[in-house]
From Swiss-Prot:
Residues 351-370 have a biased composition (Low complexity). The keyword Glycoprotein applies. It comes from the Eukaryota. It is found in: Membrane. Interacts with bli-3 and tsp-15. Interacts with csnk-1. GO terms for biological process: collagen and cuticulin-based cuticle development; protein transport. Glycans are attached at N109, N327, N330. It holds the Pfam family DuoxA. Keywords: Glycoprotein, Membrane, Transmembrane, Transmembrane helix. This is Dual oxidase maturation factor 1. Residues 324-376 are annotated as: Disordered. The keyword Cell inner membrane does not apply. It is a multi-pass membrane protein.
Length: 397
């Protein structure tokens, strides 16, 4: 009678392997990867300045993604070593495993992977460790966080090599203060990276609306990244060595050195400094042009538009200045007429005579301006002929 539990479902399922996948890192990278894919899809529709736009877009996304990755990914210092160790207590089993340490700004990641079994135990048979892989993360942002992590590790029964690493980070006495050095270095480096990210956000906004000022924020981003690397270099321990037993029963040291995130931020800092200086020099000499997001006339070009006046002698310059003065007087007169018309129209008592007078005055101004223009052109031709005749007369004499 299976409905009373006579034929229950099986309860001994095989243990599924946990995928080694960081979901938080995937979400953060998606924030920068999805806009890049969207831009690649619309890239064939970009007609003007395609190369400059693509380089700028990819560079800005790469800098932002690198800054966020360095904040969450524990890879500022790392090290790994093959060790001969005991896996569990009250057992004679000895295994060859690979232990690794990855140190970030606010956490430490310790891994232990089984390689092969060196000596078996007849008392506890049936221990299959071919799929053995530990990956534990511990917080180092607090003063006593590593001591608490060691306490929880002893309660949960972590392997001996991982407990040895936690002991090195939890000690805070005399020269055994590696955990405190990494905590202080991570704290100040974390603040410097967040400041660099704020400068990066400002550079994105300026690149869209005020491109001729974007080089300043890009330069600030690069300097902040270089300061973060310098702070981590000075405050972190010079060399962390954790002693273990090797495969041939010799002493081996697990050494933590600078890793991927440190060199990535250093490269991003140098790149931003070079780009900022290059854009600043080009802005000073008005070499390049960038269109704004809203196509504003003020920031359409890096430098203000200017034209050099033609030089043709003092008489020609005097004619140009005189023509400019007549044009300005005519424009001021037209503005006065328009303002008087608006005042009369707003009062509601605009008479036909005033309209006639205004039309007559505007007609007289147009005729006067045309006469002055013809007179200026004639005078300009006379001066030009005079300049041409002077060399001939001087040569004949």
């Amino acid at each position: 009678m299976w409905w009373f539990g006579g034929n229950p479902s099986p309860s001994d399922y095989p243990n599924a392997a946990i995928p080694n996948f960081n979901m938080h890192a995937f979400v953060i990278f998606s924030v920068f990867l999805i806009p890049l894919i969207a831009y690649i899809l619309i890239l064939p529709g970009v007609r003007r300045k395609r190369v400059v736009t693509t380089v700028t877009y990819v560079l800005m996304l790469a800098v932002g993604g690198a800054l966020i990755a360095s904040l969450i990914y524990p890879c500022w210092a790392s090290g790994s070593q093959m060790i001969y160790t005991q896996f569990r207590g009250h057992s004679n089993e000895r295994i060859l495993a690979k232990i690794g340490v990855e140190i970030g700004l606010q956490k430490v990641n310790v891994t232990l992977k089984f390689e092969r079994l060196l000596s078996s135990n007849d008392v506890l048979p049936g221990s299959d460790m071919t799929e053995l892989y530990y990956n534990e993360g511990f917080d180092i942002s607090g003063i006593s966080s590593m001591a608490e992590a060691l306490h929880h590790g002893l309660e949960n029964g972590l392997p001996y090599p991982m407990l040895s690493v936690l002991e090195y980070f939890s000690l805070n006495q005399d020269s055994f203060d590696w955990g405190r050095h990494y905590r202080v270095a991570g704290h100040y480096t974390h603040a410097a990276i967040w400041f660099a990210f704020a400068c990066w956000c400002l550079s994105v906004v300026l690149m869209l609306f005020l491109p001729h000022n974007a080089y300043k924020s890009i330069l600030a981003t690069g300097i902040s990244c270089l300061i973060a690397c310098l702070v981590y270099l000075l405050l972190s321990p010079c060399e962390l060595r954790i002693a273990f037993t090797g495969e041939n029963f010799e002493r081996v040291d697990l050494t933590a050195t600078f890793s991927f995130c440190f060199y990535l931020i250093f490269a991003i800092g140098i790149l931003c400094v070079l780009c900022g200086l290059g854009l600043g020099i080009c802005e000073h000499w008005r070499i390049y042009t960038l269109s704004t997001f809203l196509d504003a006339s003020l920031d359409e070009h890096v430098g203000p538009k200017w034209k050099k006046l033609p030089t043709g002698g003092p008489a020609l310059q005097g004619v140009q200045i005189g023509a400019y003065g007549t044009n300005t007087t005519n424009s001021s007169r037209d503005k006065n007429d328009i303002s008087s018309d608006k005042t009369a129209g707003s009062s509601g008592f605009q008479s036909r005579t005033s309209t006639c007078q205004s039309s007559a005055s505007s007609a007289s101004l147009r005729s006067q301006s045309s006469i002055e223009t013809v007179h200026d052109e004639a005078e300009l031709e006379r001066t030009h002929v005079h300049f041409l005749q002077e060399p001939c007369s001087s040569s004949s004499t």
